[in-house]
Structure formats: structure tokens, C-alpha cells
Curated annotation (Swiss-Prot):
Tissue: Expressed by the skin glands.
Full protein name: Peptide PGLa-R4
Organism field: Xenopus ruwenzoriensis (Uganda clawed frog)
Cellular component terms per the entry's GO annotation: extracellular region
Keyword line: Amidation, Amphibian defense peptide, Antimicrobial, Secreted
Leucine amide modified-residue sites: 21
Compartments where located: Secreted
Record-level GO BP terms: defense response
Family: Belongs to the gastrin/cholecystokinin family. Magainin subfamily.
Length: 21
């Protein structure tokens, strides 16, 4: 559903942010 999709997007952004550090 929408919640799972939003969670996946947030997780992806968090991963990219951590990699950027």
C-alpha cells in the first residue's frame, strides 16, 4: 500500500544520505 511505498522511499533516501556521509 501507500504506507509501505512511503517507507521504502524514506529508507532509500536514508541509505543515500548515509552513503553521502
Amino acid at each position: 500500500g501507500m504506507a509501505t511505498k512511503a517507507g521504502t522511499i524514506v529508507g532509500k533516501i536514508a541509505k543515500v544520505a548515509l552513503n553521502a556521509l
